[in-house]
Amino acid sequence: MSVKDIEHEHSYIKAYEDIQLLKQDVMRPVRMELEVMKPEIYLQRHHIEETIVCFGSARVREEKEAKGKVKAAQEALAKNPGDKNLQHRLYEAEGLLKLAPYYEAARKFANLVIEHAGDRFAVVTGGGPGLMEAANRGAFEKNGKSIGFNITLPHEQHPNQYITKDLAFLFHYFAIRKLHLVMRSKAFVVFPGGFGTFDELFEILT
């Protein structure tokens, strides 16, 4: 075998550059440690020491958008009154419209955190849409530090646009994500949400 052939063998890749190696089950502890350390390095770099954490639904939208979804569902159902899927779509849209005021509540709460605490606290969320977006938006609007700890889900969840540069993080392990949510926290605020929000709430309570 030539030297060139040897240099192209998979075993010759440096371990820390070998993605195939890092994805093996046996390397899970290393991956978990990386998920602990990467955000930690960035948070220290930005001098983040204390946080206020906001939990809440990813599905709740601003009232204007929520009303638009109800209207669209009503119009679709009017064309096919017997369609069960469209009936359920309208039911869901109406339910989310009732929760829409919490979007503004989360945004204003984060406004107040930054207005009164300045640089002392950063606002932290799960980094996704809905009420997480609202809280990040509130901090962002007041030029505060706005952090998002997102998670890989079966359905893709994009980060919201109101997270401070270099403070959006994507996790694979829920446990490590929760660790970072708790580590620097001084207070938690829980807005309406689903199973994910309840899971986070009871994790904190216990």
Question: PLM features: what roles do these ranges have?
Answer:
Residues 1-4:
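C-terminal amphipathic helix plus adjacent low-complexity
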Residues 105, 177, 197-200:
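Amphipathic alpha-helical interface surfaces
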Residues 18-25, 117, 157-160, 186-193:
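A generic short-segment signal for beta-strand/edge and adjacent turn/coil regions
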Residues 65, 198-205:
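Glycine/threonine-rich flexible loop motifs
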Residues 124-125, 129-191, 202:
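Phosphate/pyrophosphate-binding betaalpha-module
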Residues 58, 193-194:
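Residue-level signal for short, function-critical loop segments
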Residues 6-15, 19-149:
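Glycine-rich beta-alpha loop segments
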Residues 107-111, 182, 205:
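Predominant activation on well-ordered alpha-helical scaffold segments within soluble catalytic domains
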